[in-house]
């Protein structure tokens, strides 16, 4: 008999720092086993926030899929800022190059709703614009 899915959850943890807690307890999975597997799987991404989609089954087993670090976090790291602008229409908090945007877009491409790097760059540029980050060397589209 096939396992029945009881819940699907989208969570974010720091790489190698998942700990048993309320978020995992509500899923009804084997928390120590999840934290061990997650921490092992994220060894190479130390210091990054790692989104994860956890599928919990009725027999307390689970599967999980690691996603790429959120674009806003990658943009903040590239720009060297703590947070985005409180009013992005009037404030510019940092400037980054189009090359940095391309680098982020190439990394994020697997998780974005884009068919190519140029489309992914537009998505990342939109996130940057909403954070008050200006991009040099990239034409603006409205």
Curated annotation (Swiss-Prot):
A GO BP annotation: translation
Domain of life of the source: Bacteria
GO cellular component, one term: cytosolic large ribosomal subunit
Post-translational modification: One or more lysine residues are methylated.
Subunit comment: Part of the ribosomal stalk of the 50S ribosomal subunit. Interacts with L10 and the large rRNA to form the base of the stalk. L10 forms an elongated spine to which L12 dimers bind in a sequential fashion forming a multimeric L10(L12)X complex.
Function statement: Forms part of the ribosomal stalk which helps the ribosome interact with GTP-bound translation factors.
Entry protein name: Large ribosomal subunit protein uL11
């Amino acid at each position: 008999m096939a396992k029945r899915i009881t819940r699907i959850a989208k969570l974010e943890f720091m790489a190698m720092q998942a700990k048993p807690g309320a978020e995992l307890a509500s899923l009804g999975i084997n928390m120590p086993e999840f934290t061990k597997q997650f921490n092992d799987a994220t060894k190479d991404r130390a210091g990054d926030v790692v989104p994860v989609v956890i599928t919990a089954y009725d027999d307390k087993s689970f599967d999980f899929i690691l996603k790429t670090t959120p674009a806003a976090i990658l943009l903040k790291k590239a720009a060297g800022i703590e947070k985005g602008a409180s009013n992005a229409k009037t404030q510019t908090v940092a400037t980054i190059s189009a090359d940095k945007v391309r680098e982020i877009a190439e990394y994020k491409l697997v998780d974005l709703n884009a068919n190519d790097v140029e489309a992914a760059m537009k998505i990342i540029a939109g996130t940057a614009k909403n954070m008050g980050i200006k991009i040099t060397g990239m034409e603006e589209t409205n």
